[in-house]
Amino acid sequence: MAGGAREVLTLQLGHFAGFVGAHWWNQQDAALGRATDSKEPPGELCPDVLYRTGRTLHGQETYTPRLILMDLKGSLSSLKEEGGLYRDKQLDAAIAWQGKLTTHKEELYPKNPYLQDFLSAEGVLSSDGVWRVKSIPNGKGSSPLPTATTPKPLIPTEASIRVWSDFLRVHLHPRSICMIQKYNHDGEAGRLEAFGQGESVLKEPKYQEELEDRLHFYVEECDYLQGFQILCDLHDGFSGVGAKAAELLQDEYSGRGIITWGLLPGPYHRGEAQRNIYRLLNTAFGLVHLTAHSSLVCPLSLGGSLGLRPEPPVSFPYLHYDATLPFHCSAILATALDTVTVPYRLCSSPVSMVHLADMLSFCGKKVVTAGAIIPFPLAPGQSLPDSLMQFGGATPWTPLSACGEPSGTRCFAQSVVLRGIDRACHTSQLTPGTPPPSALHACTTGEEILAQYLQQQQPGVMSSSHLLLTPCRVAPPYPHLFSSCSPPGMVLDGSPKGAAVESIPVFGALCSSSSLHQTLEALARDLTKLDLRRWASFMDAGVEHDDVAELLQELQSLAQCYQGGDSLVD
């Protein structure tokens, strides 16, 4: 890679992971498209960390995610498994057989109207099989900003979104998509429901070799591979796929960082007994096995609990979302993910994945929690110290790891990112001679303000902080969730007027927290209450009773890591 980027290879495992990933890649794509805008801050994030350059058979330059994704049969909708950039119609039409032919033509799945609109604006696949790009001469970045003659882009509606590929606006490399054909996405039969089923998938030579081949393809072209980020469904059989994938990565690429994001969709209901028990077992097995093979593991969910007792989903002061819609939940989680992963994607002075994990995971604490303020509430005329002082002494961010409210818990170490605040708002603009209303108002730089605020909130705790000018992109197809924000994401009184919100400031954090002690112990308690004889179907998928006993022991040992007062400064 040019420029010495510290490359990261992303693995997306599961359908909800596909939803989060689609929003994540759309946000990366939107940021690429703004890189040449004179109003934008200079490049703070290095896209080459996540993307790779390539060429089609016809010499067209491409810039595609360094990505391997796995999903089930029936989950792609109109998206082709080989992608759209590299397809050659002339090769497709070349037939060596000279005898009589019988043609069987499969009916194409209708393309989502939003994607039709997006593709027609971007370019066309001509009759000679060459992708003719209308507005992207070198493959990097998106279309330029709309002009007066540019038709307004179509915005996808919630009703039009059935699967994640319905709103993915990024072209993928042919080596990205790996379909598990033996299980179905739709229907009640043939589902990938249990951890043991997922483990078995990557024990099969067919799928293991396919994953290894794709890994080697991407890894061998890297100059400095810093590691892997895994987006993995925890609630279904993909927890087993993720566990085996992490084990494979640890065995083959020792010394590289492996950061796993365990994803769980919106709220669940007490009446769905089998689904809830399976979710509990999959989550517990997934957390324990992923922790064993990853540098760091972070559950991500808008739910209030990982256990059997349903808790209401989290709420945000300036967001209105439907927790039953994966399209909404995944957008919020992708925004948090885009923020907390900033340290290992920086252009200058990046923190490697390994160093980030080492800082947060001391004394065996390899599971961390995430939290975010989306959007960060900066009103017109306010400075950063003004906004931070409004939080008082409370932990400011909304919890995103289904571990309950962070108030009253202990933080052992944290990595914090605040992005999207204009430099003019970083410090307080007091009239000369006016005494500063707080110690934060007396600071001379935004970085100093953020560091001092974190020290006030968590005295003596190891904190790493980053302050970026670059906001988080929330242009369509990101859903319209913001209740009182201007287009640049400033918090307003009343409903916004005019243009939709395009970008927002976000305050995100990863924390090694004592809340995990209660969460993991509660998970173990729920498991001890199960009569496993009633769930023979889960056990028949490849899990033994001894495995459950070992799981309970591992969960309790992991929970003990977060008990007591030990920290880096104790």
Curated annotation (Swiss-Prot):
Gene3D superfamilies: Tubulin/FtsZ, GTPase domain
InterPro entries (UniProt xref): DML1/Misato, DML1/Misato_tubulin, Misato_II_tubulin-like, Tubulin/FtsZ_GTPase_sf
Tissue expression per record: Present in all cell lines tested (at protein level). Widely expressed.
Keywords recorded for this protein, A-Z: Cytoplasm, Disease variant, Membrane, Mitochondrion, Mitochondrion outer membrane, Phosphoprotein
GO biological process: mitochondrion distribution; mitochondrion organization; positive regulation of mitochondrial fusion
Coiled coil: none
Main location: mitochondrion
A Pfam family matched in the record: Tubulin_3
Cystine pairings recorded for this chain: none
Record note on what altering residue 8 to M does: In MMYAT; autosomal dominant; patient cells show decreased mitochondrial fusion and mitochondrial network formation; patient cells show increased mitochondria aggregation and fragmentation
Domain of life: Eukaryota
In-chain residues carrying the UniProt-annotated modification Phosphoserine: 495
Resulting phenotype, residue 376 to L: In MMYAT; uncertain significance
A GO CC term attached to the entry: mitochondrial outer membrane
Localisation per UniProt entry: Mitochondrion outer membrane; Cytoplasm
Function: Involved in the regulation of mitochondrial distribution and morphology. Required for mitochondrial fusion and mitochondrial network formation.
Disease linkage: Myopathy, mitochondrial, and ataxia: A neuromuscular disorder characterized by muscle weakness and atrophy, ataxia, poor growth, delayed motor development, dysdiadochokinesia, dysmetria and additional neurologic features. Some patients show skeletal and endocrine anomalies, as well as behavioral psychiatric manifestations. MMYAT transmission pattern is consistent with autosomal dominant inheritance in some families, and autosomal recessive inheritance in others.
Protein family according to the UniProt entry: Belongs to the misato family.
Protein name per UniProt: Protein misato homolog 1
Species for this entry: Homo sapiens (Human)
